[in-house]
Every structure is written in C-alpha cells, then in structure tokens.
Amino acid sequence: LIERDEVAVELSRGLVQALGLEDKITIKKTDFLVYFEDASDYDAVILASLLFTSGDTEELISHLVKNIKFKNCLVRTVRGMRQLLYKKVDEKLLEKYLKPELLVDPQNHILNSILLYSHV
C-alpha cells in the first residue's frame, strides 16, 4: 500500500495487523509520484477511485505504468444511474496506458462495477 496521508497509513497498519497480514501487505508512507519500483513484481495493483477525482490522474497512471512492475490492475467504477452516487472513472484514459480485460457489473445490492486491466 502506498499512501501519503499519515492518518490513513496508521489506520491501514492497524487493519493489516488486526488481520494478521503483516507478512503479505507492506505499507509505505510516501507520495506515489516520488515512489519508484523496489524490484518487486506485483500480481495486481488496485487503483483507489479517489485517484480519478484529482487533477493529476494521467500523471499518476503514467508513473504507475512506467515505474512499477505489475501484471493486472483493478479499478472500481460505476455505470448508469449509479453515477449519481459515485464518480465514473475515465476508461479512455486508462485504455491509453492499460489493456482492458474484463468488466464485472453489479448484481443485487452491489453498487460498483469492477474493471480489470493488464499491463501492456
């Protein structure tokens, strides 16, 4: 987990510890744009939907693709009337850097769709 907010980092550390996942999840407090690959290969990167509310979304995605080794990327989005509740991600921007693989739309009471992309 890469997070720049100290409060979010501390909450995340507490959650990871409570779940007993310290050996599986690493938390780094830093700004993502100054974070460079640490030689790890990641199976998946999960992009927080708040990323798409910032003005530097493209810069962040470009940095991710150029500097982090990963196979897949999961993104939460919304479609249709659900956009009244949440911001839809810019899929065209994502497709500029990543290859779309799968879209899972909600069933029953689930609000969000999940997009799966692969690293090109």
Pin down the residues of each PLM region:
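Conserved SAM/SAH-binding beta-strand->alpha-helix loop
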Residues: 5-7
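Conserved SAM-binding strand-loop segment of SAM-dependent methyltransferases
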Residues: 21-32
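C-terminal substrate-binding/active-site "lid" region of AdoMet-derived donor-dependent transferases
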Residues: 57-111, 118
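Conserved SAM-binding motif I beta-strand of class I
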Residues: 1-3
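A short SAM/SAH-binding and catalytic strip from SAM-dependent methyltransferases
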Residues: 42-57
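Conserved SAM-binding loop
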Residues: 12-13
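Conserved hydrophobic residues forming the short capping helix/wall of the S-adenosyl-L-methionine
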Residues: 16
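Short conserved loop adjoining the S-adenosyl-L-methionine
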Residues: 34-39, 54
